[in-house]
A protein has these predicted regions:
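Short loop/turn segments immediately following the C-termini of beta-strands
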Residues: 30-32, 78-80, 125-127, 135, ...
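Short loop/turn segments immediately following beta-strands, especially the blade-tip
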Residues: 42-48, 89-95, 133-142, 191-197, ...
């Protein structure tokens, strides 16, 4: 009897460990090639192995984010017409997906989405705007509440001649939203007031000809890091009450390709990664000083063509990079001590892959 009880306990323990190792991985794509929408996979964050689970037809789901309970997926449809939308998808057991609702962004080419509590946001690149949605109690429907417009003012007359908003994210303190105003070389601030946003001025003005693109925050919320597309630089900031104070600029794109893309911190906050496109494509690697927030460049990992977006597994063991023009997701094993990356050559074949997100099972 003791043996049977012990055996059951051991089996249960092994099952729990295996369950923690497995993630539901959701991939967004552009559908002008061989893809038809969103794909779900089971990804083992200890072995780096992936297995496809389901797919859902959707036009250009180029950016995705999950609800806090991972039951809802928010996906943009990045189109330059009235079909540009925010889509809400149910994520079921075993990665099954069902489209619940869609709402027009009323801003062309939504390329980023964030959701928290009763609000969802899309950054509409060609529309030059940020759309603010109120979510239903169950999180299965979205109603457009308002739009905020970006501006121009940057010196690049071909890339900054009309407004572009590229990213909108909630601050860690839960009180503000920051949006990258690409063409005006600034980051805008909005105060959260219940189910609405109130304009809160300029969080920071960045260097001219930067083209601010994506923003991420340190775990403790004291620092923020910006990847700028045109300058190819990462800017480190101190964050406080909806404002950013620049403390450092450091080069990510060392060849001046003007194709800076995505940016993420490792789960432990000790390393930062930024991707670069168009020339010498790859991911720049930086160490982070925990006390000051300052960065030191320590490496560079070449990738496939056009590394538009990437993400790290929750345990920090792997970095997965969406290489749009190579039609694959590269799987890199990450040394958690040094922060450096090694290509596992376990590529996941996905046509026009541009976004990957993870949820624990």
């Amino acid at each position: 009897m003791r043996f049977n009880v012990f055996s059951c306990m051991l089996l249960c323990s092994l099952f729990c460990v295996q369950a923690q190792d497995n993630l539901t991985m959701i991939v967004g794509t552009y559908t002008d090639g061989g893809s038809h929408g969103v794909y779900s996979y089971r990804f083992n964050q200890m072995t780096g192995e992936a297995r496809v689970l389901d797919s859902l037809a959707l036009k250009n789901p180029s950016y995705l984010t999950l609800s806090s309970d991972a039951r809802r997926l928010y996906a943009v449809s990045e189109t330059n017409d009235e079909k540009a939308s925010l889509n809400i998808i149910n994520i079921g057991r075993n990665g099954t997906m069902q489209l619940l609702s869609s709402a027009a962004t009323e801003g062309a080419d939504p390329c980023y989405v964030a959701a928290k509590g009763a609000l969802a946001l899309t950054a509409n690149y060609s529309g030059g705007s940020m759309s603010v949605f109120r979510l239903s109690t169950k999180g299965d429907e979205a109603a457009l509440a308002t739009r905020f417009l970006g501006a121009t003012g940057g010196p690049d007359r071909s890339r900054q001649n009309v407004p572009h908003v590229h990213c909108a994210c909630f601050t860690p303190d839960g009180r503000y939203v920051l949006a990258t105003d690409f063409s005006a070389d600034r980051i805008l601030s909005y105060r959260i007031a219940g189910q609405r946003l109130v304009a809160n001025g300029v969080a920071t003005q960045v260097s001219a000809d930067s083209g601010p693109r994506h923003l991420t925050f340190s775990r403790d919320g004291r620092f923020a890091y910006l990847m700028s597309e045109l300058s190819g630089k990462v800017t480190a900031f101190r964050y406080s009450q909806g404002r950013l104070e620049s403390i450092q600029e450091i080069v990510s794109d060392s060849v001046g390709a003007r194709g800076g893309a995505d940016i993420h911190l490792s789960p432990d906050g000790r390393f930062l990664y930024s991707s670069n496109r168009l020339k010498d494509e790859g991911i720049a690697i930086f160490s982070v000083d925990a006390a000051s927030g300052l960065l030191t460049r320590i490496g560079y990992q070449p990738t496939g063509a056009h590394p538009r977006q990437f993400n790290l597994t929750p345990n920090g063991q792997f970095l997965l990079c969406c290489c749009r023009d190579s039609n694959k997701i590269q799987v890199f094993r990450r040394d958690t001590k040094t922060g450096l990356l090694t290509d596992t050559h376990k590529d996941i074949s996905v046509s026009r892959a541009v976004c990957v997100q993870f949820a624990s099972e």
